[in-house]
Amino acid sequence: MTLNLCVLTPNRIVWDSEVKEIILSTNSGQIGVLPNHAPIATAVDIGILRIRFNDQWLTMALMGGFARIGNNEITILVNDAEKSSDIDPQEAQQTLEIAEANLRKAESKRQTIEANLALRRARTRVEVINAIS
C-alpha cells in the first residue's frame, strides 16, 4: 500500500508521486506518516522532509507551510522546497556562513529575528545535503 504525496510551492510542483512513508517536520515536532494514517491538518515547520520512495530514503528542505493528510493522500503546501539533489553544497555552506555572520551583526530585535530565520533556512539546506539516505 502506498501514499500519494504532492509537495507544492506557489510557483511549482516539487513532488507528485506515490511513496511508502514520509517523516515530516511540523511545528510540534516530527511525525511519521504511513498508509491509512488518521486524517490531520498541520503546520509545517522549516525542516527536512524524508521520503521513502522505491525502498530508498530521499530528503527535501521545506521552508514552512501547511500539510493535509487523509485517505492515503498527503498534500504539502510550502513557501519553498528543494530536493537534496538540487542543492549546491558549496552555495549552501556559504549561505550558512553568511547567515551566521548576519546574526552576529544584528543590532535590533527585528534584525535578530530575520537573521535567526535565515539561519534556520540555511541550516536546513545544509542538513538536507548531509542527511543519511
From Swiss-Prot:
Q: Which UniProt keywords apply?
A: ATP synthesis, CF(1), Chloroplast, Hydrogen ion transport, Ion transport, Membrane, Plastid, Thylakoid, Transport
Annotated InterPro entries: ATP_synth_F1_dsu/esu (IPR001469), ATP_synth_F1_dsu/esu_N (IPR020546), ATP_synth_F1_esu_C (IPR020547), ATPsynth_dsu/esu_N (IPR036771)
Q: Does the keyword Plastid apply?
A: yes
Q: Where in the cell is it found?
A: Plastid, Chloroplast thylakoid membrane
Grouped into one coarse class, the protein's main location is: plastid
Q: Would you identify the family this protein belongs to, as annotated?
A: Belongs to the ATPase epsilon chain family.
Its name, as the record gives it, is ATP synthase epsilon chain, chloroplastic
- Species source reads Citrus sinensis (Sweet orange)
